[in-house]
Amino acid sequence: MRARPLATLVTSGDKGLNANHIPVQTLNEPAPLGSIRGHIARANPLWRDYAQGSEALAIFQGPHIYISPSLYPSKAQTGEVVPTWDYAVVHARGVMRFIDDPEWLRSFVTGLTAAHEASRAQPWKIDDAPREYIDKMLRLIVGFEFSILSLTGKWKVSQNRPLADQQGVVQGLQGASDADSHEIAAMLAARGR
């Protein structure tokens, strides 16, 4: 969740389901499962349409990759193979409260920005912009806190295939150039230990 902080937030309101893609910050507090914080544009109807106290779902998409049947050694033996998709995802269920407080928002976006700028050679800080401009921008957003009630990890990493096919997938993905292939290969290799 921390490694891939763009959550798909699914809520229900008077107009039905609503899905938003929101960068968030995951916190360990309150125990036992923690919370998720974020902000949305004030113009986004989510904060007005959300039925207070109703369940919400935050989906964190992990690595995912198409798996060609050509990676399976069993293709040459039986030909009984088809393509699939391997993936890892986390579903966080909880309830939300919206926060329309300028000081809370300033503190939150300062911390969120610092976390995402930390690895840069010259990190941008909220204080780099004129205070009046930041004040104006803060009036255009609403914060939220999502109290996590349950976490469910879902993954499919070719674990249903015979060991030889799993090893073929690991070898094939390790030779790929993208990060998702390498992450799925590592998950499958770790599972086989």
Where are these regions (language model features)?
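Binding-site signature for planar aromatic cofactors or substrates
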Residues: 1-193
